[in-house]
């Protein structure tokens, strides 16, 4: 649709770059393969009763929905004019001029004029990743006298995304173009549908 702010940003924002978590594509494919295997077991090569098959179908629907919402969908769209964030049940678009600061500790969190925005596609490093990060990885990202945290390392999703964002923010003043209007769209229907499948999966689990 032409009035879709995210799509309009993708088409008109300039030099679009879509960021996803490392391994998101692999985990998405593996998740769907697992669900397909369960579906085959339940309905093609199965001796389960009809009620058990219905219960398995509810569980498969919940798992498939989870793979899509939590792994496949989350992404960050970087453009010259602004940023678009797709979280499991929301889509946010804003101009770089609306960004005040970036935090990378747990997930990439954008401190904006409209409030904090957390990006599911860019999580911070785990404890094991903290141990693998070498101080040399952070030298090129040193910003003046400010201390650089492990979460800012390009080896973490949050650090890599923040690095791209800072480059785009610095370049925004050089780019002429329309001001990107802030838009926060909550996908309540998807959230309700997900809650229903979760409840059905829970009931199905106890009926197996």
Task: Identify the residue ranges that each predicted region occupies.
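N-terminal membrane-targeting/pre-transmembrane regions
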Residues: 1-47, 163-208
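Interfacial loop-to-helix junctions that mark the boundaries of transmembrane helices
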Residues: 48-52
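Conserved beta-hairpin
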Residues: 63-96, 100-104
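A membrane-cytosol interface segment of integral membrane proteins
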Residues: 116-180
